[in-house]
């Protein structure tokens, strides 16, 4: 018997987590669900959308699955997703993107994974208001976090039988921050035995390459079947993983895993969609 923390979430969260439980039950795996509430439903009572008892439950059970939780735009409380990743040190966001039989999409043979560094970059939340005339956000990229996420991506690639590891960056413009990420990408992929191809060498083995983020966006639309595992800083991963979801039918069919050394939280990628909650859609 496995014990897993279940966070239903806001909006359609109650419906999608109920459906998820039925699917899991159909597999025959014995799971005891420990349900805890987070999000808008507890904000007034606890003064936070993420009460301590939620974190305590996840730390006890080591694994959680959650429905979507509403995040206010431009005001209000900070994202619960971001807080969970920070508090539990869930450094890797993993989003497999595959075409599914029976689901209409523009492509038939996509099988790739976006691996996103989860703890820093512009999503570290280091922001400052400068009077009424400016706002400042700090882009934080560290060697340790970059090393950790690229190492994770290398192991993921090998464990899942993929060949191509692609580092995504904007080092042509952000030469210090993204430049550091790219240097670490080369060091760590080489350390894991994943080398760049020599000129003219056929890609018949595992290999590494890199692509600037805007070129990655274009090529993911033009030739998504050519990619396997892409690893990148936080912001790029957030944007490109949603783009990839659009290639195979939308956010509603894409899973997401947030993984750390000690804990893992699995979730739906889509939002809470309060406008359709309770309609059985």
What name fits each language-model region?
Residues 1-3, 29, 60-61, 89-90, ...:
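Short coil/turn connectors at secondary-structure junctions
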Residues 10-13, 62, 115, 153, ...:
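Buried hydrophobic positions in well-ordered alpha/beta secondary-structure cores of metabolic enzymes
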Residues 40-44, 219-281:
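Glycine-rich phosphate/nucleotide-binding loop
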Residues 30-53, 220:
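N-terminal beta-loop-helix "entrance" segment that forms/cooperates
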Residues 85-99, 207-209, 253-269:
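Short, acidic/small-residue loops that bind anionic groups at enzyme active sites
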Residues 5-26, 131-214, 226:
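Glycine-rich phosphate/diphosphate-binding loop of Rossmann-like nucleotide-binding domains
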Residues 44-136, 235:
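N-terminal glycine-rich phosphate/adenylate-binding segment common to multiple enzyme folds
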Residues 42-44, 72-73, 172-176, 218-219:
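Short, small-residue-enriched loops and turns at beta-alpha junctions
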């Amino acid at each position: 018997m496995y014990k897993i923390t279940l966070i239903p979430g806001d909006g359609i969260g109650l419906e999608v987590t109920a459906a998820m439980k039925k699917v899991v039950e159909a597999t025959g795996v014995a799971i005891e669900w420990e349900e805890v509430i987070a999000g808008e439903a507890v904000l007034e009572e606890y003064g936070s959308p993420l009460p301590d008892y939620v974190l305590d439950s996840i730390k006890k059970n080591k694994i959680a699955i959650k429905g979507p939780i509403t995040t206010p735009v431009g005001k209000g409380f900070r994202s619960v997703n971001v807080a969970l990743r920070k508090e539990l040190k869930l450094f890797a966001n993993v989003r497999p993107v595959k075409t599914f039989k029976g689901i209409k999409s523009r492509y038939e043979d996509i099988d790739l994974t976006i691996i996103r560094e989860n703890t820093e970059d512009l999503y570290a939340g280091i922001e400052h208001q400068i009077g009424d005339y400016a706002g400042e956000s700090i882009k934080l990229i560290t060697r340790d976090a970059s090393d950790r996420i690229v190492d994770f991506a290398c192991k993921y690639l090998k464990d899942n039988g993929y060949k191509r590891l692609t580092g995504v960056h904007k080092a042509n413009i952000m030469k210090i921050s993204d430049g550091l990420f790219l240097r670490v990408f080369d060091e760590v992929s080489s350390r894991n035995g994943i080398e760049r191809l020599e000129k003219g060498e056929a890609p018949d083995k595992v290999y590494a390459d890199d692509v600037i983020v805007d070129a990655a966006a274009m090529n993911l639309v033009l030739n998504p079947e050519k990619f396997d595992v892409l690893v990148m800083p936080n912001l790029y991963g957030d944007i490109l993983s949603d783009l990839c979801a659009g290639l195979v039918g939308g956010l509603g069919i894409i899973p997401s895993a947030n993984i750390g050394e000690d804990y893992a939280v699995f979730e739906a990628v889509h939002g809470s969609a309060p406008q359709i909650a309770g309609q059985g859609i």
